[in-house]
UniProtKB/Swiss-Prot annotation:
One of its GO terms (cellular component) is plasma membrane. InterPro entries: AAA+_ATPase, Chromosome_initiator_DnaA, Chromosome_initiator_DnaA-like, Chromosome_initiator_DnaA_CS, DnaA_C, DnaA_dom, DnaA_N_dom, DnaA_N_sf. Domain I is involved in oligomerization and binding regulators, domain II is flexibile and of varying length in different bacteria, domain III forms the AAA+ region, while domain IV binds dsDNA. The gene is dnaA. Residues 87-112 are annotated as: Disordered. It is found in: Cytoplasm. Residues 75-114 are annotated as: Domain II. This is Chromosomal replication initiator protein DnaA. SUPFAM superfamilies: P-loop containing nucleoside triphosphate hydrolases, TrpR-like. The keyword DNA-binding applies.
Amino acid sequence: MSENMEELWSKTLEELKQQLSKPSFETWFQSTEPVEMSSTDLYISVPNEFTKDWLNSRYKNSIENSLKKISGKQLKIKFLLPGEKIKMEEQNNENEEKPESTSKKSSQGSEHTTWLNPKYTFDTFVIGNANRFAHAASLAVAEAPAKAYNPLFIYGGVGLGKTHLMHAIGHYVLSHQPNYRVVYISSEKFTNEFINAIRDNKTVNFRNKYRNVDILLVDDIQFLAGKEQTQEEFFHTFNTLHENDKQIIISSDRPPKEIPTLEDRLRSRFEWGLITDIQAPDLETRIAILRKKAYLEKLDIPNDVIVYIANQIDTNIRELEGGLIRVIAYSSMANKKITKETAEEALKDILPNKQPKKMTVEHIQKTVAQYFGLKVDDLKAKKRTRSVAFPRQIAMYLARELTDSSLPKIGDEFGGRDHTTVMHAHDKIASDLKKESHLNETIDEIKNLLHGD
């Protein structure tokens, strides 16, 4: 082949650039790089899994056609994530197919496989008021298994981070104690394996598998409700591990006392250690989660778009991140830049219809005061220190922009100030907005807070 892989990929990109819109090309191809080429395959590095999936599903045929046109050969395109190794044909075995698994051998010779998502670590977990205690408890357990809280019971709604914390515990333990036998399993899979073990007359093997571990992580324990035989088996598994100072971590969508048809003896054991909950994230945490997601996936998302999404989706982290992905995908398919307007279009079909509230000066005062850590009375008082005067000017500017109130009326709401004071504040902020990008971000964030209530 005459071209080396850099030349070949560069020519391919030029070809694709002619076929695609500028936003689509910049979104999906600008961060790609060739890393290896054989007689049949060209391996391309991509920044994140979302890009990999998108290129595979949407552009693979176009890329391979362009490659053939340029090189004269039918090359297959293969995308690699950062750190992902090229799979050779002779290495086609189970461990290669499932790189996320970590295998350990017990003294009885049975294989322990821990299924941990490499993305779910303490480093990627965003801490906020709604999950701070659960995070601290999980880290304490990871640092000192069976010494801090045993069992650790984490409960909360769907998509709030319970599974993330459980995987993070597993990763932390294995990174500090590589010889530990760590098993993560859902209660549904535990039940299915138990049923199969009874059917195949392999209950001894089943018990050896789960009673000879150092860390047992059981997700969604509420699904054991009503399954008497499985509860009986788990009861004895729990006892064996606890008596041998082995750590047990359990998650559920509700606390033990609210799980229906759960045997009292199991319920009481779940309450032996520490019970902690995770609530829905507040606005600040939702913004932080989206920023972290964008950073980890190497996505350039404008701040006002992140704030908008965080304001609109307040249910759980899974839907929040799903909203971000939807905006990215929509902007690419519609050949539009990622802006707040694009985000509004992308999310309009999945967001509940909200009747816009009539904006009031009082609502603006409360929101601005909260944003700057002040009291509403501070905005109405005669204080002229910058820490108060600047937020007051912003509040007056927004009151003039977003309400139907007259200048004298706005002045009255701010401690009986003259209408010329309101006019001066409005003009000053309007002028500063043309020069200071940071002020634009501040105003956008406050507007999003105002419309998000």
